[in-house]
């Protein structure tokens, strides 16, 4: 089992980046972002280094799943209030692991459950549509910069 858990040959890709400038403001869409030990520069949740929810990531495929549940053609990633949309790698399999995006290293700390804002942003049923599809949270281990199109790689020696 340990060998199976350590096998992550897939390399993901950053599809979208957004920061939350202030409470209840729309996310600001970015092509690249600077990351300090306190979080994403420009994000309102940037703060104390080492916090478990400094960065949020969501699976690109989950946008399609949530849209399908809500009978929508598509969903604007900004409505989901997550920082990074990733394709090509299973984020849920990365819990307690470190990932590298550009020269930034993050440690995936846990699930990112939906908040009541999902009902407001997505309409009636939005909260329940997001359950089990809300993505993951991460803390910053190494600061740097990354952009849309950059690879998302699991660092294999990082299981906690």
How would you describe each model-predicted region?
Residues 1-160:
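Metal-cofactor-dependent catalytic cores
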